[in-house]
């Protein structure tokens, strides 16, 4: 985004970041067009973001959750994932850092790939500032790169592995397949 905040970028592109955060159709379609996303990619983006279903429920990865299971002032993530993202390119470390959708869900407590607990990266009450990932990541990038957020590894439990698979693929061959996640 060439050094501008998400809010400034959104305005430059003709929509507000607040409208995008709340997945208003015009803002989403503008972002989809800017990113050159096809219909399947659009649906994947929305499913990993979480879409409001009324006042207190959200659809996330084909499941229905209470909003608070996904939307909180504290933003969590795996510092190892973010560090690997940063190391994957030359240039500003934050240019490649990607926030993962599953990190939003309060039931997800571990990055299964790295066996690392999710840690709170920042806590901001105002959603427009909270979800300006570019700005927030700039504030903590050096800490991520030097391992300040790193914690001891943890072996994933059967629950961690099951939840990761169900969210990632929608496949559940257990007796829980007909049960909702929340």
At which residue positions do the language-model features occur?
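A structured, charge-rich N-terminal accessory region that forms the first stable segment of a protein
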Residues: 1-91, 97-98, 102, 168-178
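A short secondary-structure junction signal
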Residues: 89-93, 121-124
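Domain-exit/linker segments immediately C-terminal to small folded modules
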Residues: 104-182
């Amino acid at each position: 985004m060439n050094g501008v905040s998400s809010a400034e970028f959104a305005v430059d592109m003709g929509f507000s970041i607040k409208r995008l955060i709340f997945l208003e159709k015009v803002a989403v379609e503008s972002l989809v067009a800017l990113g050159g996303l096809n219909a399947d990619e659009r649906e994947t983006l929305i499913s990993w973001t979480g879409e409001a279903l009324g006042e207190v429920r959200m659809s996330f990865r084909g499941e229905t959750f209470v909003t608070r299971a996904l939307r909180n002032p504290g933003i969590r993530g795996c510092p190892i994932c973010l560090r690997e993202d940063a190391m994957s390119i030359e240039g500003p470390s934050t240019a490649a850092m990607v926030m993962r959708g599953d990190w939003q869900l309060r039931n997800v407590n571990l990055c299964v790939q790295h066996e690392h607990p999710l840690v709170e990266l920042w806590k901001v009450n105002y959603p427009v500032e909270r979800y300006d990932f570019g700005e927030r990541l700039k504030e903590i990038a050096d800490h991520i790169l030097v391992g300040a957020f790193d914690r001891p590894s943890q072996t994933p439990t059967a629950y961690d592995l099951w939840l990761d698979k169900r969210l990632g693929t929608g496949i559940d061959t257990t007796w829980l397949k007909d049960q909702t996640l929340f």
